[in-house]
């Protein structure tokens, strides 16, 4: 995979080391967020997979997609590409549940121009368990 962004970060494989989220030059000590350890991450991904594939007629697929996206980004299972994979999972889930008929959903631009709010909203869920504000933000991203 010569010339591919992130090629030194084991593309396609779950991470085997601790990662963190923060600005350029951040370390584990001053990270904005530290995802689960590699050991816990595997358990979290298994739980997420079960949730994604559970037959759940009571949760609207758009809301479930938002919850799945939050959880995937919180788990952060790869050293690189989590955002891209997370956005792809949204599209695949909505196609599977017939919310989309074609893979024509582009929320990357919305999330890019609202990056600070995107991170802040996910942090609110982690700090306070406030999923409602996250789901509203996610639905706004889908709508726009």
Tell what function each PLM region has:
Residues 1-144:
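FIC/Doc superfamily catalytic core
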